[in-house]
């Protein structure tokens, strides 16, 4: 090592030691506080679902969420991918149901706060979202006529106490759906309109019960939330809330130069008072 470079090394050690832990500016502290779970507003009423806050609907929805009977082959439920002990996701790069999908399972903690659903936001109500995996051939691979028969046979009484009388299903084919296989679509098209309407109503109510359950899936407090709370209170974050220098520098980037916070701007995209230019409030 030359004399010059050893001197440089000494200077660098001295500079790094003198730096200590990186600090946040007041503006950064304000942004961090805005990202804390405690800033999550109370759940708004779901104006698309009359049963959203009916406890019996949520209870039935919870049964259906975990029931593998709610699939074509009887092997997959919502909870196959949305696992209760992993914030309702599965740690896989791509979700696997009846087949392998091309997307990652989204966590459901706090999902009822979202204005729209799926990675691409292609559903705008929680109950309509729930119907999609039920008929997706790679996920639950069922069809609405089969689900309607299943609900009547298995949960008829519980269903009727919430949603009123089930229709007469004697003329409804075992398998039929406007989105299914060729045979299922042909069976669906052959059904009288009023009968298709009745099946659609039961299918929609399945979604509404599941959505009522999903309103109860609250996000747990994380290390980040404890860190943000301590920081907002002017206290030195302690225990697992104490961030390492790398974590602090990463957070500075996240809310600063790297612009992540433009989109990832609060618990479930809801704190729109800061930064939010890409995902507008609804
Ligand atoms: C095969 C695995 C799998 C099954 C089964 C499954 N999901 Fe999902 N879920 C996913 C994947 C993957 C996504 C993202 C898919 C996309 O964006 O196209 C997702 C997205 C969602 C979302 C959107 C979350 C958000 O923040 O936008 C909700 C809500 C949801 N699922 C609920 C359900 C319900 C309810 C069921 C059962 C009726 C279910 N899922 C069944 C894998 C699954
Ligand atoms: C323009 C908006 C936008 C910006 C800026 C942005 N993200 Fe994202 N990010 C998204 C969206 C939308 C998704 C989910 C959709 C997808 O995967 O295509 C996502 C997904 C993610 C995921 C995956 C989450 C999961 O559960 O699989 C991570 C991690 C992530 N972003 C981190 C970051 C980081 C770190 C930055 C800054 C360097 C950043 N994002 C900047 C919009 C954004």
Residue map of PLM features:
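Periplasmic c-type cytochrome electron-transfer domains
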Residues: 2-5, 18-282
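Bacterial N-terminal signal peptides
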Residues: 6-15
């Amino acid at each position: 090592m030359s004399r010059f470079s050893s001197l440089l090394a000494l200077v660098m050690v001295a500079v790094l030691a003198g730096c200590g832990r990186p600090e946040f500016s007041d503006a950064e502290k304000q942004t961090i506080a805005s990202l804390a779970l405690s800033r999550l507003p109370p759940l708004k009423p779901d104006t698309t679902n009359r049963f959203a806050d009916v406890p019996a609907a949520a209870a039935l929805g919870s049964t259906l969420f975990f029931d593998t009977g709610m699939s074509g082959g009887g092997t997959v439920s919502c909870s196959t991918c949305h696992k209760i002990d992993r914030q309702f996701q599965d740690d896989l790069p791509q979700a696997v149901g009846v087949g392998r999908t091309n997307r990652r399972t989204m966590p459901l903690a706090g999902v009822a706060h979202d204005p729209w659903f799926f990675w691409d936001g292609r559903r705008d109500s929680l109950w309509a979202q729930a119907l999609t995996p039920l008929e997706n051939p790679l996920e639950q691979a069922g069809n609405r006529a089969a689900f309607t028969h299943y609900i009547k046979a298995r949960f008829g009484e519980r269903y009727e106490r919430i949603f009123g009388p089930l229709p007469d299903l004697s003329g409804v084919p075992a398998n039929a759906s406007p989105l299914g296989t060729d045979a299922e679509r042909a069976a669906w098209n052959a059904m009288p309109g009023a009968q298709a309407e009745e099946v659609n109503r039961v299918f929609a109510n399945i979604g509404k019960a599941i959505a009522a359950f999903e309103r109860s899936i609250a996000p747990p407090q994380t290390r980040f939330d404890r860190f943000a709370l301590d920081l907002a209170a002017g206290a030195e974050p302690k225990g697992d809330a104490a961030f390492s220098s790398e974590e602090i520098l990463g957070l500075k980037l996240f809310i600063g130069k790297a612009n992540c916070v433009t989109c990832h701007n609060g618990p479930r995209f809801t704190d729109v008072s800061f930064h939010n230019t890409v995902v507008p409030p609804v």
